[in-house]
Amino acid sequence: MSHSINGHFTPASLLKFAAPSIIMMMFMSLYTIIDGIFISRFVGSNALSSLNIVYPIINIVFAIGTMLGTGGNAIISRYMGEGKNKEAKECMTQFVVISLLISVVILVLTHMNLTSISRILGASDLLLADCDSYLSVVVSFAPAAILQCLFQSYFVTAGRPNLGLVLTMIAGILNAVLDYVFIVVCQMGISGAALATGIGQSIPAIAGLLFFTFSKGSLHFTHFRLHLRELGQACYNGSSEMISQLSNAIVTFLFNIVMMRLAGEQGVAAITILLYGQFLFNAFYLGFSIGIGPIVGFQYGAGNKKELKNIHRIAFLFVGISSVLLTIAAVTLSTPIVSVFTHDADTFRLAAPGFKIFAINFLLSGLNITSSGFFTALSNGLISAMISFCRTLVFIVLSLLILPTFLDLTGAWIAIPVAEFLTLLLSTVMHVRYFFRPGKQNYFI
């Protein structure tokens, strides 16, 4: 494994190394997006709205998994870079066990308060039954969902990124097939979509458990003593990614409330479609950050400042160029993209023009995600969390509270682009301070 992340990286080799994580994250995002397509087309726009109403609970599960996945991975890869393989294995095992315990608690509490949670999240009388149906099934697979988040990071550090890629692709394809079987053939409605998602998530979760149990490589499960300091560091390092997921829950909730007020159930369906676009786009850059994270952590632990600077340069050059290209594609193809999700005329009328405005944020979000991820890999959880917290919560909430008041629907569409722009200013200041200004805080010196 050390040879795969310890050498000199060119743009091609860095992208090749990160590609499995990128594809994995995009396939993971497709679980929910495929559900949305089948639900909207074969169940209805109200069912699509219901999925988005309860999605904050799913965000909480992903938040825990992402925190201990990316944050824990920074600890594991650093230990391996320092030659401390025993500590790396013990920490990984501990993170998996604790994540499983947390997911079981979430599962039990949600089932005990199902209808109350749906109501709190904004379900109207028209949407309540579908909200309860989807949430009750999908939260039952919380342990699988949280393990999948962890293993997508740990496979990379174990030197087996392609295994994670293959498993995620199989799970994504199975999810799509089961969506068709459960929703179209068996007429199970929104519950069928949740069941398909859960089964899909179980594939990489079970395979990951088997791999790290029987692996003879440098990273596998082992007996462990509690590493409370490392657990705290993992939570700290991964706090930005956790904040991002928790903020998604809060922002989704606020968007649902705002859109229900401005345009009713069709408004919620429209913003769901736009958020799906953002979900897939952000998954691309989150996967890239996860993919290069072990390299950054290893080079930092090994004290190789020259290669660290090289990786930084390549990463942001790639993100900048690809963001421009993907934004142009999103704006140009906005109408066919929206039409994939809905045939409902009212929903399409709201979503199609909104997507063109909303897509502006794609130009900026990749840079911000990569900035936060880079600081996470360097074990600078404070800066990473600050960027993520402002990007995914503070700036968006302020935009949502202010802009729709004066601009109605247009204010809702531009809330995230405005937040991304403000975050880019903050990220730029942090990068100048920690990467380009001479001094003890400079990671390149």
Regions found by a protein language model. Name each.
Residues 1-18, 76-141, 185-239, 296-361, ...:
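Short alpha-helical transmembrane segments in multi-pass integral membrane proteins
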Residues 21-74, 138-145, 232, 236-298, ...:
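Transmembrane helix-bundle signature of multi-pass secondary active exporters and lipid flippases
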Residues 28, 32, 36, 40, ...:
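Juxtamembrane/transmembrane-helix interface segments of polytopic membrane transporters
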Residues 30-33, 42-45, 79-82, 157-158, ...:
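Helix-loop interface residues and adjacent transmembrane-helix termini in multi-pass membrane transporters
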Residues 35, 72, 113-114, 151, ...:
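Hydrophobic/aromatic residues in alpha-helical transmembrane segments
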Residues 48-108, 145-163, 270-334, 365-387:
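Small-residue-rich hydrophobic transmembrane alpha-helices
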Residues 60-63, 175-180, 205-209, 279-283, ...:
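Hydrophobic transmembrane alpha-helices of multi-pass small-molecule transporters
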Residues 69, 137-156, 167-175, 193-206, ...:
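Short runs within selected transmembrane alpha-helices of multi-pass transporters and secretion channels
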